[in-house]
Amino acid sequence: MKRFIYILGLLILSLTSFSDALVQKNISLDIAQNLASEVLKEAKKEKVNISLVILDKGGNVVLSMKEDNAAVHTMKTAQKKAFTALSFGITTTEFASRVERVPNLTQIENTTTLGGGIPIKAGNETIGSIGIGGAPSGAIDEKIGNAALSRISNLLK
């Protein structure tokens, strides 16, 4: 009987540890919608038509949208920006600096050095990313994304 209780205790402890390991922060559709709304407000202030892609921690598209007058290439560009930011956990602007030191990084499929890709973080943990394309420069795309992220920062805790 003691052996049974001992084994049962170990089983319960291991299940508790296992369930804790499965709990991960991730970007939800609700957060993605709030972020997209803020991005569109910022894009309107900048008088640019953009496309945006928001990825979750696993690289799945949570939300993508293209404004009516955004150029045709902006959706694919936004996707690459989001993928790059998620893959490396840094902005695409920072990735461009890294590529200067390690040019072979450009061989990684679906990455880009164009500004406008930003990791979405909860504390120090990357829980997703956003890619924005359509402004005359990647710096403006990134400015739009950072402003929007700062306005929803309370949702990322």
Where are the language model's segments positioned?
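Flexible, solvent-exposed loop/hinge segments and secondary-structure transition points
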Residues: S19-K157
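Bacterial N-terminal signal peptides
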Residues: I5-T16
